[in-house]
Design a protein with these regions (language model features):
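N-terminal cap/lid segment of alpha/beta-hydrolase-fold proteins
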Residues: 1-21
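Catalytic nucleophile-loop/oxyanion-hole region of alpha/beta-hydrolase
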Residues: 36-38, 65-95, 99
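Alpha/beta-hydrolase-fold enzymes
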Residues: 105-189
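Active-site glycine-rich loops that stabilize anionic/oxyanionic intermediates
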Residues: 26, 34-37
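Catalytic active-site module of serine/aspartate enzymes centered on a nucleophile-bearing elbow/loop
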Residues: 241, 246-273
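Conserved alpha/beta-hydrolase
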Residues: 41, 46-70
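Short beta-strand/loop motif that positions the catalytic acidic residue
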Residues: 210, 216-218, 222
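Short alpha-helix in the alpha/beta-hydrolase fold that links the catalytic acid
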Residues: 212, 226-235
Length: 273
């Protein structure tokens, strides 16, 4: 597995990216991580995909990982979609004339779905795992009201993101690794949280506009993102393949169902080539 790091620059931000190259690349997977984490947490996925001749290109979002800027903040949702566009172009430059798939988890799942709906054709397909379309909990009303006020007067102020590390996986080692990862944070600005909540609602309502095949994977035990939002999205488009894993936790690629889930991803990608 050949690995290289790279950077790109937009919105006065230096983005950190990495590429894991397969020996014989049949397709390239552009990966977008979830809230509070970073692309380095997907090395095991990249390794498995590489073993099946799929190269992987990933990056750290605004306010995350090794990308510069204030933790948990982005300039706008449009800027998020532009960062996805740039990483896709990077992938095309690394692997010319190669089919490209977008793969997003949670927050990244929201980003790739909205990108596909608003920005693009020319993708082979999309994989979205536990996509942030609908929260599994109601944010405290006072916190939501404060967030809306701050978005108007101080959009970069950050507060806690309400994620409980114990809710990411049923495997204790994964929870401990998450807690002890120095690049993981729990910060989020109103400009980040509210725009993703709104874009998730919009995506569900406009799913019928999707023109690209999408694999939707979610777990019924997710305490962070409501799997029923993913179900509703699937119902609203003819392009979706949906699979639910019973009782799993939010990070299904780090949960007890991870082997089955990765097999499903690999089989679906292969079916789209």
């Amino acid at each position: 597995m050949a690995h290289k790091e790279f950077n790109f620059h937009i919105y006065n931000t230096t983005f950190y990216g990495q590429c894991w190259k397969a020996k014989n690349t049949k397709a390239v997977i552009v990966l977008a991580h979830g809230m509070g984490e970073h692309s380095g947490r997907y090395i095991h996925i990249a390794k498995t995909l590489n073993e099946h001749d799929f190269s992987v290109v990933a990056f750290d979002h605004f306010g995350h990982g090794k990308t510069t800027g204030k933790r948990g903040h982005n300039p706008s949702f449009e800027a998020v979609l532009e960062s996805v566009a740039v990483i896709i172009e990077k992938a095309r430059a690394f692997f010319p004339m190669t089919p490209v798939f977008l793969y997003g988890h949670s927050m990244g799942g929201n980003a790739v779905i909205n990108y596909a709906l608003k920005k693009t054709t020319h993708l082979q397909g999309i994989i979205a795992t536990s996509p942030f379309l609908k929260l599994a909990f109601e944010p405290p009303k006072i916190k939501l009201a404060l967030g809306k006020l701050l978005q108007k007067i101080a959009p970069s102020v950050t507060i806690g993101n309400e994620i409980n590390p114990n809710d990411i996986s049923r495997e204790k080692i994964e929870v401990d690794t998450y807690i002890n990862d120095p690049l993981i944070h729990s910060k989020i600005s109103p400009n980040f949280s509210l725009t993703f909540i709104d874009s998730g609602k919009w995506a569900i309502e406009n799913a019928s506009q999707l023109t690209i095949p999408i694999l939707l994977l979610h777990v019924t035990g997710d305490k962070i993102i409501d799997y029923r939002g993913t179900q509703k999205f699937a119902e609203n488009t003819k392009r979706a393949t949906l699979k639910l894993y019973k009782n799993g936790y939010h990070e299904l690629h780090n949960d007890l169902c991870k082997k089955e889930m990765l097999e499903d991803v690999i089989n679906w990608i292969s079916s789209q080539l």
